[in-house]
């Protein structure tokens, strides 16, 4: 059964899950030419859309995710659970530990 969700706001990650949306590469060159969609590569850069509350480890310590909503992060090329949205967008659900890096804002 396949159900398309209308927006990422209807997805609430559990435990240490992080919901991200891939940042789209520029489809326009510096000279103003538009590139065909198939020639625009997918970036490994994403924006955090939602974050789970964390989890309790075996010692009873609360482990919270290291990212927050709005952070720019680097994600692995493969992995995560892709979720299709009704507006032809998609979001990806990762574990916090699978996020490669947080991008510092200048």
Curated annotation (Swiss-Prot):
PTM per Swiss-Prot/TrEMBL: The N-terminus is blocked.
Molecular-function annotations in GO: ATP binding; metal ion binding; protein folding chaperone; protein-folding chaperone binding; unfolded protein binding
Keywords: Acetylation, Chaperone, Mitochondrion, Phosphoprotein
PROSITE patterns: CHAPERONINS_CPN10
Compartment(s) where it occurs, according to its Swiss-Prot or TrEMBL record: Mitochondrion matrix
CDD domains (UniProt xref): cpn10 (cd00320)
Function per UniProt: Eukaryotic CPN10 homolog which is essential for mitochondrial protein biogenesis, together with CPN60. Binds to CPN60 in the presence of Mg-ATP and suppresses the ATPase activity of the latter.
N-acetylserine modified-residue sites: 2
Residues recorded as bearing Phosphoserine in the entry: 31
Note: Present with 149 molecules/cell in log phase SD medium.
Protein name: 10 kDa heat shock protein, mitochondrial
Gene of this entry: HSP10
């Amino acid at each position: 059964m396949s159900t398309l969700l209308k927006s990422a706001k209807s997805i609430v990650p559990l435990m240490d899950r992080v919901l991200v949306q891939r940042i789209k590469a520029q489809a326009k060159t510096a000279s103003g030419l538009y590139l065909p969609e198939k020639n625009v590569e997918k970036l490994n850069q994403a924006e955090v859309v939602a974050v789970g509350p964390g989890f309790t480890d075996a010692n009873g310590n609360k482990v919270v995710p290291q990212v927050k909503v709005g952070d720019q992060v680097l994600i692995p090329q493969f992995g995560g659970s892709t979720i299709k949205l009704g507006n032809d967008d998609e979001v990806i659900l990762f574990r916090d530990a699978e996020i490669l890096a947080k991008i510092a804002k200048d």
